[in-house]
Amino acid sequence: MEIFNQIYILCSGLISGVIIFQSLIVASSIFTVLPEENAGILLRNLFPKFFLFLIFLSSLSLTFSFLANLNFYPFGFIGILGLLSMSVCYFIIPKTNQARDEKDDSLFKKLHTLSVSLTLLVLFLNLAVIFLIS
């Protein structure tokens, strides 16, 4: 059971690290290095993979929370929230891109804000695991 516990913690750390790396380093660097047109093309390629990877890690996290026999609340709940939140982010990508292409700034801003908010929620919940598990 201890190995499952360690893998659960590792998954939470990976989720947090991937979000921080993608948000603070990759996305911000792309906008400073590439022209806006090319940055958009690259980000449209990266973000679906980013969300799919987080869905995968959240699924692992949820699985290992059960295998480690951790309390559903908060540990399994964090996995479910991660899985659902990142799925929403993934599935709104086409509408977000369409809003950007059609210059529907209001809809784009709402969808982008939803995506960022859900990603931050998942980040904070997974960072909290370190404090909750000890």
Predicted regions and their residues:
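Polytopic transmembrane helical bundles with strong interfacial aromatic enrichment
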Residues: 1-134
